[in-house]
A protein has these predicted regions:
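Single conserved hydrophobic/aromatic residue that forms the stacking wall/gate
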Residues: 1-10
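Short hydrophobic "helix-edge" motifs at membrane interfaces and signal-peptide entry regions
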Residues: 16, 89-90, 131-133
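Acidic, Mg2+-coordinating catalytic module of metal-dependent nucleases/exonucleases
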Residues: 63-70, 75, 80, 111-160
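Conserved DEDDh/DEDDy metal-dependent 3′-5′ exonuclease domain
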Residues: 22-107
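Ser/Thr-centric signal marking residues that sit
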Residues: 3, 100, 146
Length: 160
């Protein structure tokens, strides 16, 4: 969706937010309270999706692509739709997503025992990608890193 012009999308949460989540994302509760209401963001989001996908066409869907999205982001995005009274999330998205963390496993399985973890930063470094540590956990930068990891492992696949 980043490549489709969505950019950083913020929405005011309608649930309790843990301090640890605020720290990781480097935002305050005050900043979150200043975000537009969730419904307003949902309407804009669906309008943007409809420019590219016909939700009534079973052959026209987006792939959700991310780093660790299959077990994390996909569920939150689907819950966002449900919270807005929309049970048709899969009218927009294929049920199978592209999780770059999972795809990276095959390419790093011989190095995995030497790696401290399998976080995006660690995987990127293991693949020889330069990291700007100050930008980690910034949504746009995380998208850029995910794309670089995907491109790197894709080129490795074709090299044999």
């Amino acid at each position: 969706l980043q490549s489709r012009g969505l950019g950083d999308v913020y929405k005011r949460q309608q649930c309790e937010i843990e301090e640890e989540a605020l720290r990781i994302c480097n935002v305050s509760k005050e900043q979150i309270q200043a975000y537009p209401p969730m419904r307003e963001v949902y309407v804009k989001f669906v309008n943007m999706l409809s420019k590219y996908v016909d939700k009534f066409d079973k052959k026209d869907k987006f792939f959700l692509v991310g780093y660790n999205n299959a077990s994390f982001d996909n569920h939150f995005l689907k819950a966002f739709f449900v919270q807005n009274g929309d049970n048709y999330f899969y009218s927009w998205f294929w049920v199978n997503s592209i999780d770059v963390m999972v795809l990276s496993t095959q390419h790093l399985m011989r190095k995995r025992h030497e790696m401290t973890d399998f976080k995006q930063e660690t995987v990127a470094r293991a693949l020889g990608i330069q990291i700007d540590s100050a930008k980690l956990h910034d949504a746009s930068y995380d998208i850029q890193l995910t794309k670089e990891i995907y491109n790197r492992i894709s080129s490795l696949s074709f090299m044999g």
